[in-house]
């Protein structure tokens, strides 16, 4: 049990690090260049269309990260987008925000460059 708790802390620290060390962090299935699910591809493509620099974390490479990010955010699905440490949401929310212009506003108000 003690080792499991320690492992959970290591996973939490790794997730924390990804979020804190990158202004925009996307926990996704696959990579930005080779997404492994349609939802991850959608969010990755939106970020690319906005020309936002982002860190893609492939949850398929680590089952504990895949499970841990869901607990970390209290959100049941992947992908998950974080901007400046704030959890934004999954595919549906990001897509709606993109279509309404709210996502671009969120980036600019957070000091993140986007395509004009």
Predicted regions and their residues:
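Non-catalytic, surface beta->alpha helical segment in thiol-disulfide oxidoreductase systems
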Residues: 83-115
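Eukaryotic intrinsically disordered and solvent-exposed regulatory patches
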Residues: 11-13, 66
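Thiol-based oxidoreductase modules, predominantly thioredoxin-like and allied folds used
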Residues: 48-66
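Local sequence-structure signature of Cys/Sec-based thiol-disulfide redox active-site neighborhoods
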Residues: 16-53
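Thiol/disulfide oxidoreductase modules built on the thioredoxin-like
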Residues: 71-77
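Acidic beta-strand-to-loop metal/phosphate-binding motif
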Residues: 27, 80-84
């Amino acid at each position: 049990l003690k080792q499991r708790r320690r492992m959970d802390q290591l996973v939490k620290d790794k997730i924390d690090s990804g979020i804190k060390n990158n202004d925009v962090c996307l926990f996704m299935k696959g990579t930005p260049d080779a997404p492994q699910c349609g939802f991850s591809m959608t969010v990755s493509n939106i970020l690319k269309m906005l020309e936002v620099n982002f860190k893609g974390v492939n949850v398929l490479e680590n089952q504990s990260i895949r499970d841990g990010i869901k607990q970390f955010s209290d959100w049941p699905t992947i992908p998950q987008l974080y901007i400046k440490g704030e959890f934004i949401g999954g595919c549906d929310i990001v897509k709606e925000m993109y279509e309404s212009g709210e996502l671009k506003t969120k980036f600019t108000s957070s000091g993140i460059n986007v395509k004009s």
